[in-house]
Amino acid sequence: MKLLLASNNAKKLKELQRILDQAGLDSVELLALRDVEAYDEPIEDGRTFADNAQIKARAGVAHTGIATIADDSGIAVEELNGMPGVLSARWSGAHGNDTANNELLLAQMEHVPDERRNAAFVSVCVLALPDGQEFVQEGRWEGQLLRGPKGENGFGYDPLFIPAEEIGGQGRSSAELSAEEKDALSHRGQALRGLVEKIAQVAAAS
């Protein structure tokens, strides 16, 4: 069975591949957008993570005829009423500029005390099948914002985020966790694992 991840993000691709491997789904051939005939990527103009994930998954399956997984994810900061939210990747105005996004968020939270720095990573993953069926899973990873970046692993806002599991413990940011540790805890790991059973069913029937 072929499965398209509607992304060219190498780290997301590796993350999904690890989760499929852990589930024993060796029969699933994972593809990225670069592996299929190019198509115009849709405008992500949804108001929620689920909206945007559906837009990407539907576009992928419509253009390729291949079962497609798409995710939309970001960080929701309590003090900012849930923002950056769906704007996380382009919070500073430049899409995918992690450094600029992190710097802006830190500046906006500069004078906020530790007890009001609650945040959560949120991910919604959608599996869209060629027959029109869709399956949606959400993951949420609670924690707090740090006052400066820590760690070299991960991407996005990982260096600014201390998971709830690390508060009062080692105090590592999500960018200091190993890939395996992050998979077990993260918002995207939760959402992707929620789709594994359905992927296995589709693979068995194909």
UniProtKB/Swiss-Prot annotation:
The keyword Nucleotide-binding belongs to this UniProt entry's keyword annotation: yes
Source organism of the structure: Corynebacterium glutamicum (strain R)
Annotated GO CC locations: cytosol
Binding locations of Mg(2+): D72
Binding, substrate: S7, N8, N9, A10, K11, K12, S73, F155, G156, Y157, D158, K182, H187, R188
Record keywords: Hydrolase, Magnesium, Metal-binding, Nucleotide metabolism, Nucleotide-binding
Annotated GO MF terms: dITP diphosphatase activity; ITP diphosphatase activity; metal ion binding; nucleotide binding; ribonucleoside triphosphate phosphatase activity; XTP diphosphatase activity
Subunit comment: Homodimer.
Residues the record marks as active site: D72 (proton acceptor)
Transmembrane segments: none
One biological process term in Gene Ontology: nucleotide metabolic process
Cofactor(s) needed for function: Mg(2+)
Keyword RNA-binding found: no
InterPro entries in the record: dITP/XTP_pyrophosphatase (IPR020922), ITPase-like_fam (IPR029001), RdgB/HAM1 (IPR002637)
Pfam family, one: Ham1p_like
PANTHER family, per database record: INOSINE TRIPHOSPHATE PYROPHOSPHATASE, INOSINE TRIPHOSPHATE PYROPHOSPHATASE/HAM1 PROTEIN
Role: Pyrophosphatase that catalyzes the hydrolysis of nucleoside triphosphates to their monophosphate derivatives, with a high preference for the non-canonical purine nucleotides XTP (xanthosine triphosphate), dITP (deoxyinosine triphosphate) and ITP. Seems to function as a house-cleaning enzyme that removes non-canonical purine nucleotides from the nucleotide pool, thus preventing their incorporation into DNA/RNA and avoiding chromosomal lesions.
Taxon lineage: Bacteria, Bacillati, Actinomycetota, Actinomycetes, Mycobacteriales
Family the UniProt entry places it in: Belongs to the HAM1 NTPase family.
Catalytic activity, reaction form: XTP + H2O = XMP + diphosphate + H(+); dITP + H2O = dIMP + diphosphate + H(+); ITP + H2O = IMP + diphosphate + H(+)
Protein name per Swiss-Prot or TrEMBL: dITP/XTP pyrophosphatase
Gene3D superfamilies noted in UniProt: 3.90.950.10
Cofactor note: Binds 1 Mg(2+) ion per subunit.
Enzyme Commission (EC) number: 3.6.1.66
